[in-house]
Amino acid sequence: MTLIVGLGNPTSKYENTRHNIGFMLIDALKNSNFTDVSSSKFQGELFKYSNLLLLKPTTFMNLSGNSVKAVNDFYKPERIIVIHDDLDLPFGAMKFKKGGSSGGHNGIRSIDTLIGNDYERVRIGIGRSGNAANFVLGEFSPEEKEHLAEILEYGTQAVNELIKSDIESVAQKFTIKKGVL
């Protein structure tokens, strides 16, 4: 079984913010084949199809590890893939890696604290401007919004390939270093 986690913050207040690009990609991956298997014990929205789980933690970003640990403990997936925003990559850049440090990302830090860092990551660049907290919790600019659909489509292709392949192959094929703006 593979668990794919998209990081973000719950509630409509944060729905269209940069920090929620992980949630957005989970929504793009989810189709009518998936069944909602959410439960309060998982602290998140959880969808299942065959041997694939999609998770959107509803704990707020800094406590994402609680949700990931609950699902991990219950389903015991062989593989975990976490999708998250990255301030240190230009907007629209995409990188893939296994393990490593949190890079200052509090959602990743929370997961690392509770289950370790032996999982794959899809890092989607959101760029950086001004105060980091205000920036990640801000909505995409009109110019960024013009590119969001293509970034999510590309991310969907990459994650669908990753499900069938290994992180190194996907990194070679799908890494974008420069972003779109």
Curated annotation (Swiss-Prot):
Q: Which UniProt keywords apply?
A: Cytoplasm, Hydrolase, RNA-binding, tRNA-binding
Q: Which reaction does it catalyse?
A: an N-acyl-L-alpha-aminoacyl-tRNA + H2O = an N-acyl-L-amino acid + a tRNA + H(+)
Q: Name one GO molecular function term.
A: tRNA binding
Predominant location category? cytoplasm
Provide the top EC class: hydrolase
Cite the position(s) of the site with description Stabilizes the basic form of H active site to accept a proton.
85
Q: Which GO terms describe its cellular component?
A: cytoplasm
Q: Where in the cell is it found?
A: Cytoplasm
- The source's superkingdom equals Bacteria
Q: What is its EC number?
A: 3.1.1.29
- How does the record describe its quaternary structure? Monomer.
Sum up the protein's function in the record's words: Hydrolyzes ribosome-free peptidyl-tRNAs (with 1 or more amino acids incorporated), which drop off the ribosome during protein synthesis, or as a result of ribosome stalling.
The protein depicted here goes by the name: Peptidyl-tRNA hydrolase
Q: Please name the gene that encodes this protein.
A: pth
